[in-house]
Amino acid sequence: MSFSPLIRQLIESLRILPGVGQKSAQRMALMLLERDRSGGLKLAQALTAAMEGVGHCRQCRTLSEEELCPQCADPRRDDSLLCVVEGPLDVFAVEQTGYRGRYFVLKGHLSPLDGLGPEAIGIPELDARIRDGAFSEVILATNPTVEGEATAHYIAQLLADRGLTLSRIAHGVPLGGELELVDGGTLAHALAGRRPIS
């Protein structure tokens, strides 16, 4: 079956979403056109508004509709702590823990195979933010992947002589998890990162 040019354009546009392949995009496009045109128009309006109205916070670089995001605009936050994360969703996740320091959002992680070096993910901007701030501790909260670990290591090397406390988020057995269900790599990290009981 051959789709009309407008339907093909809609399908191709939907395919830019993560995890959406050709078949899923076709199903979504046809569902919107056949069953929920008002929902499709509402989606188009919300997408246009977000693309035009959402930018990046000038301090931490998370997504924001204002020049400063709510976390950077809050004077009650701890200016001595800086948490470095890979993306805006990570800020949301860390906020759920009650963390009250500042953030810096990278644009992903180092990935030379994908052409993502230090400049592409914002390491020079991080360096400038740390130089301009009054931070005493930098928390490296990149993901526990090979690329996330490499990114944390690179940043730690860059900041090693600054007189800052550098810390890495812990990895290991999830709270409430059972050891027999934990994979070997995760358990090895948990054992290597063990700490004394006080």
From Swiss-Prot:
One of the GO BP terms on file: DNA repair
Molecular function GO terms recorded: DNA binding; zinc ion binding
Zn-finger region bounds: C4-type: 57-72
PROSITE patterns given in the database record: RECR (PS01300), TOPRIM (PS50880)
Domain Toprim: 80-174
The keyword Cytoplasm appears for this protein: no
Alphabetical UniProt keywords: DNA damage, DNA recombination, DNA repair, Metal-binding, Zinc, Zinc-finger
Gene3D superfamilies per the UniProt record, alphabetical: 3.40.1360.10, 6.10.250.240, RecR Domain 1 (1.10.8.420)
Function of the molecule: May play a role in DNA repair. It seems to be involved in an RecBC-independent recombinational process of DNA repair. It may act with RecF and RecO.
NCBIfam families from the UniProt entry: recR
Family membership: Belongs to the RecR family.
Record's protein name: Recombination protein RecR
The organism of origin for this protein: Pseudomonas paraeruginosa (strain DSM 24068 / PA7)
